[in-house]
């Protein structure tokens, strides 16, 4: 018997394994599945944040209704209105006890905002900038369907009336368009500045680069002479071009400014526009958010609806007025 008879025979059959093509296919499929899972998780988180934002507006609406049942009028617009309903929102007394006490705004002696820490319910978690400052807030009352200016009084055809004026109080009986068809409050993105968070953040120098990257967080100026309401569309076209520069948004950041308000002059998530002419002293300041396709809007009956960016302009205008007599079908 030869020596070779005792040596094991080697199999000529190829061993099973992955080819490079198969490996690449597996990696590609894994990457696609991972991206789908991440997208689903992110979408789910944003849906949860949008629902939380809707819940905040609903609680604000309920607090306003309770405030009305106590005082017989709606709270004044701006920060002070939010301060007055804060005990009804989170149970903390704040600086003024509104339970059973007359509204200082109604008596013509409205205090300044002062050093006030905002309740968490006034923050929308979809906007990461709410964590930057102590006094920034996400929500604002409706100033109606017309221009308004900081410090002006009694200029709103909505439920908010600009600055404090004891002769311009509004009650539910003044909302003849119906509580279910009249917007009460919505949301706005907080503006950005180039300095660290502080009480005087709004005094920081304007940062054009930040504004260009975040156009919905600022009020954009116009350079042309627009002095009549019918010129508003021309003014907006100039503002949308971004050529005129911008200023920090007074109604979002900081929250210690008197008039956190928005109006229905432009559709949701449009640029805010500030005219240059003195006869148009207030901006066109629509609600803005990071929610996909629209914003949450709270109504005077306590309900909250999601309004898409492409809403019919006439319907949007009608939702802003309290006594315009328009129909708001189509929302």
PLM region descriptions:
Residues 43-331:
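Internal low-complexity, small-residue/proline-rich segments
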